[in-house]
A protein has these predicted regions:
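Conserved segment of the thioredoxin-like fold in thiol-based oxidoreductases
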Residues: 122-152
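Non-globular targeting/processing and membrane-anchoring segments
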Residues: 2-83, 88-115, 119, 137-139, ...
Length: 233
């Protein structure tokens, strides 16, 4: 591979632009280091609590595969000791029966990456809705790869922070790990419960939602008044 340039300039840029861009580059380098430092700290977490219940979910592939019951322990494929699981808000709440547009936007992206992700770790998306409704939503979106689960018959969502006392659903990402015959909770996107910065939302799952990174690279940035929709004109 040819050696990369250590600096660059683009056609017709001003000195003012280059100075500002170089300052920004230093901030981007610091951010890259900080991202890796946080990731390393996360990787070094001790094991969380042992999962005491081998939860039974209804499961389905997005396509035409059969609906079947599957235990949490069965979500770990041979040779893969880690499970990444996303709690999808569907229904959003007892009085909001529709699937969450935000979660839908996230899984629109994750589904495309699922074949890559599952080369190394297990991946599933769980909703409280019955599995036939969840799969129909997946079909409507064109999802093809992410394993779908329904927790309608168990207490997983409530036990792991994704369901409020009134049945409100919350969008959380979780990591579980298998060690021998035991399954441990390892990590959950607890930034969801942290007070957000002024003018921001929680940004607890931005790491799996590249849309916002694209907006962050533009002059428009993120909009305080815009969010994903289930459909557009």
């Amino acid at each position: 591979m040819a050696e990369k340039k250590t600096s660059t300039r683009f056609p017709y840029e001003s000195t003012e632009y280059r100075r500002a861009r170089n300052r920004l580059l230093q901030s981007e380098i610091k951010l890259r280091r900080q991202i890796e430092a946080v990731a390393e700290q996360r990787r070094k977490l001790p094991l969380g609590g042992v999962v005491k219940t081998d939860y039974v979910f209804d499961s389905a592939e997005p396509g035409e595969g059969a609906i079947k019951a599957v235990r949490l322990s069965e979500l770990f494929a041979p040779g893969k000791r880690t499970l990444f699981l996303y709690n999808f808000m569907f229904p959003q709440a007892p009085d909001m029966d529709s699937p969450c547009p935000t979660c839908t936007s996230i899984i629109d992206t994750v589904d495309g990456a699922a074949r890559h992700v599952t080369q190394r770790v297990n991946l599933a998306v769980v909703a409280k809705a019955p599995i036939d409704r969840f799969r129909q939503h997946a079909r409507n979106r064109g999802w093809q790869h992410a394993l779908l689960l329904s927790s309608s018959g168990n207490t997983f969502n409530h036990d792991y922070g994704a369901e409020g006392e009134n049945g409100q659903q919350w969008p959380l990402a979780h990591v579980f790990v298998r060690r021998g015959k035991k399954i441990h909770h390892f990590w959950t996107s607890e930034l969801w419960w942290a007070k957000p910065e002024p003018g921001q939302d929680m940004r607890h799952v931005d790491f799996m939602w590249p849309m916002w990174g694209i907006f962050d690279a533009t002059p428009e940035g993120r909009s305080k008044s815009w969010g994903p929709s289930l459909s557009y004109p």
